[in-house]
Regions:
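Hydrophobic secretory-pathway targeting helix
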Residues: 1-34
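Juxtamembrane non-transmembrane "cap" segments at the membrane-aqueous interface
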Residues: 155-179
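Terminal transmembrane helical module of multi-pass membrane proteins
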Residues: 174-222
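Juxtamembrane interface at the cytosolic side of transmembrane helices
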Residues: 2-11, 113-160, 209-222
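Hydrophobic alpha-helical transmembrane segments
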Residues: 46-59, 81-91, 106-120, 137-156, 201-206, 221-222
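Alpha-helical transmembrane signal-anchor/signal-peptide segments
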Residues: 26-47, 167
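Individual transmembrane alpha-helix segments
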Residues: 68-111, 190-200
């Protein structure tokens, strides 16, 4: 029985990091993060004229597009005050790609929530409760290791990390834009570096909590 239970336990350990990372990313990818970032004293101003209110308006609209079920026309129909479209064709193509990644990430997140919750509900089965919480504990430790490595990479060379991250999900070069393009004006590198840092800190916090919780509960079970 223990050998059989080690298989789902191993699976739980592996999915905990993905669950925590996606949860933290979803928390950060919210309008309140844009409110916080755009209003930071040291946040870089847009050299091409966007005010903080402009950035909040268009930034939140763009974020909404990524998480809603609307088609590309949700953004492509938007015009800037000078009559030009909010995003040019290359930018819109990238936003469509980003939405696909985000929507896939949401589906994966929901599945992970369901798997972890179902496994937790099944802890009434003889012998499984200890295996489950031990797996959660190990998943927390694994997450801590991964996040420390990511935070180190961010601290040492964020530009390289950022490029590698995009190359993982998008066609080479499709995510590179001019400084005058709307995407760069709305979402400068400062916003991304802070976002990755906050996501890492939230994930690390969740991992520590789960590892402590799993450790305590697994040891209380005889």
């Amino acid at each position: 029985m223990k050998k059989w239970m080690s298989i789902p336990g191993f699976i739980i350990t592996l999915i905990v990091p993905f669950f925590l990372i996606l949860t933290a990313a979803r928390i950060v990818a919210n309008p309140f993060y844009l409110d916080y970032e755009y209003n930071q004293p040291g946040f870089p101003a847009d050299p091409y004229g966007f005010t903080t209110q402009d950035r909040l308006k268009w930034g939140k609209l763009s974020l909404d597009y990524l998480f809603n079920q609307a088609g590309p026309e949700f953004l492509s129909a938007e015009k800037l005050p000078d009559g030009n479209p909010l995003y040019n064709d290359r930018e819109m193509s990238h936003m469509i790609d980003v939405k696909k990644v985000v929507q896939s990430g949401l589906v994966a997140w929901y599945i992970l929530i369901a798997v972890i919750a179902l496994a937790g509900i099944l802890t009434f089965r003889p012998g499984w409760k200890q295996t489950y919480w031990k797996a959660v504990e190990r998943g927390g430790y694994l997450t801590i290791l991964l996040i420390l490595l990511v935070l180190l990479a961010v601290a040492l060379n964020f530009d390289q990390f950022f490029a590698s991250f995009h190359q993982l999900f998008f066609t080479s070069g499709s995510w590179l834009f001019y400084a005058s393009d709307t995407l760069i004006r709305l979402f400068p590198i400062k916003l991304w570096s802070d976002g990755f840092t906050f996501t890492g800190i939230l994930t690390l916090t969740g991992a520590i909590l789960l590892s402590v919780l799993g450790r305590n509960l697994s040891r209380k079970i005889v």
